[in-house]
Amino acid sequence: MKYKRIVFKVGTSSLTNEDGSLSRSKVKDITQQLAMLHEAGHELILVSSGAIAAGFGALGFKKRPTKIADKQASAAVGQGLLLEEYTTNLLLRQIVSAQILLTQDDFVDKRRYKNAHQALSVLLNRGAIPIINENDSVVIDELKVGDNDTLSAQVAAMVQADLLVFLTDVDGLYTGNPNSDPRAKRLERIETINREIIDMAGGAGSSNGTGGMLTKIKAATIATESGVPVYICSSLKSDSMIEAAEETEDGSYFVAQEKGLRTQKQWLAFYAQSQGSIWVDKGAAEALSQHGKSLLLSGIVEAEGVFSYGDIVTVFDKESGKSLGKGRVQFGASALEDMLRSQKAKGVLIYRDDWISITPEIQLLFTEF
């Protein structure tokens, strides 16, 4: 079995009727495929949108609401109804499901990140299928992941999945928008996610969901940099999930980095919030970015911000102004200033095990398009 542990992300458009309401037949089809894969020995996680779609009608809304409070209320009602649909269908095959609602803070806070990882590990080891969504009812912008594409990639990286599958209404990444460009061709295999790939992703998306192809590509960066390959394929076929697991479905395959980031490095790269800035000289910049060395105090030119021992800072090349990466400091800001002022600074500010270099691929995640 090539892909034992698989994370599936199912978007709103793959779960709803034309009027935006939840399609029970589509949910049933998804659970049947999950059951077949589970019985074949796969460990599965489902990241599912659709809470708002499942709940807005029950609150008397004629169509999907647009106001934040209305959407949060609809999600509060719909999350239970959606889970009931999944749970009922899976129990018919004697499969236990579990609900987990996450926010960005569950990834940013290292203790909560560890707790979420442990809970998911136990569920998978006990043969349950975790069903995950963002906690839309209470989340605020500062703690919001933003879309389930990103959430699914974060989860796939966290549990070190063997494959992440995006099920959508577009059967992969095209060179243009296939809905309007007859010359657009699907890319079957993507080795590296670069600016050209990002530009190609600026087209297709549907009105019911919140994420188009661009969010999927940026999410794929998180997964592939963490060692998890990604497959984008259509949800329109009745056996699309099974075919994706067997690599017989038409779609776009994103190759994972051969040496994916470990859990600690994932946290540093994607979630750790910087509390300050450090500027270094040319020698220190080369030692960090080219030779995998620790950051010595002797290479520091300037420091800015209020940070304490153990906090995360961003390091810049003083000469070029380029961001080199992030790391955990061994000294607070005031102690560091005193040592730099004495001009006798010796020792290590950031050890290499507490450091992550920002690659061009990772940098794209923090670029506005």
Swiss-Prot record:
One of its GO terms (cellular component) is cytosol. It comes from the Bacteria. Substrate binds at S49, D136, N148. Its EC number is 2.7.2.11. Its main location: cytoplasm. GO terms for biological process: L-proline biosynthetic process. GO terms for molecular function: ATP binding; glutamate 5-kinase activity; RNA binding. It catalyses: L-glutamate + ATP = L-glutamyl 5-phosphate + ADP. Catalyzes the transfer of a phosphate group to glutamate to form L-glutamate 5-phosphate. This is Glutamate 5-kinase. The gene is proB.
